[in-house]
Amino acid sequence: MQTPTLHGDGFLLTRLDTLCDMVRSNSMWYLTFGLACCAVEMMQAAASRYDMDRFGMIPRASPRQADLIIVAGTLTNKMAPAIRKIYDQMAEPRYVISMGSCANGGGYYHYSYSVARGCDRILPVDIYIPGCPPTAEALLYGLIQLQNKLKRPPAVIAR
């Protein structure tokens, strides 16, 4: 991937997909899917102390307007079809962050009959945030890692 270069007259010379990836990484609109106590930390990260808005991340109530879904809490088998339907309503490209031990692998309720044992069985997860519950700083770190992942050049496999 070619890095954008700024010329003397203020023109940015780059490929269109590179520019779109750069803009997309700095303008993530997220959908919160809080299922348990991790949602409290997610709300704290959006409050004034940490302020996810300064990273270009704006909460959205509709999946059709969101680029990212943050799954926080225990995902049950009964809730799995609902989250999959919400994910399918999101426009491409779409990203998933799994926040907390329960969303990552079931957490304390891993052996319960009603737990999906991780949202990666339902959705393709891009970033995992460990902890029970993870702190607001950990969520911000995960969001920044997702931004960095989008800015990275794609791997090209050639034979």
Swiss-Prot record:
Membrane topology: Peripheral membrane protein
GO cellular component: plasma membrane; respiratory chain complex I
An example Gene Ontology molecular-function term: quinone binding
EC top class, as a word: translocase
Residue ranges of the TM segments: none
Entry keywords, A to Z: 4Fe-4S, Cell inner membrane, Cell membrane, Iron, Iron-sulfur, Membrane, Metal-binding, NAD, Quinone, Translocase, Transport, Ubiquinone
Record EC number: 7.1.1.-
GO biological process: aerobic respiration; electron transport coupled proton transport; mitochondrial respiratory chain complex I assembly
Principal cellular location given in the protein's record: membrane
SUPFAM superfamilies linked to this entry: HydA/Nqo6-like
Positions of [4Fe-4S] cluster binding: C37, C38, C102, C132
Catalytic activity: a quinone + NADH + 5 H(+)(in) = a quinol + NAD(+) + 4 H(+)(out)
Cofactor field: [4Fe-4S] cluster
Subcellular location: Cell inner membrane
Cofactor note text: Binds 1 [4Fe-4S] cluster.
InterPro entries (UniProt xref): NADH_UbQ_OxRdtase-like_20kDa, NADH_UQ_OxRdtase_20Kd_su
Family that this chain belongs to: Belongs to the complex I 20 kDa subunit family.
The protein's assembly and partners: NDH-1 is composed of 14 different subunits. Subunits NuoB, C, D, E, F, and G constitute the peripheral sector of the complex.
Function: NDH-1 shuttles electrons from NADH, via FMN and iron-sulfur (Fe-S) centers, to quinones in the respiratory chain. Couples the redox reaction to proton translocation (for every two electrons transferred, four hydrogen ions are translocated across the cytoplasmic membrane), and thus conserves the redox energy in a proton gradient.
Protein name per Swiss-Prot or TrEMBL: NADH-quinone oxidoreductase subunit B 2
Origin species: Azoarcus sp. (strain BH72)
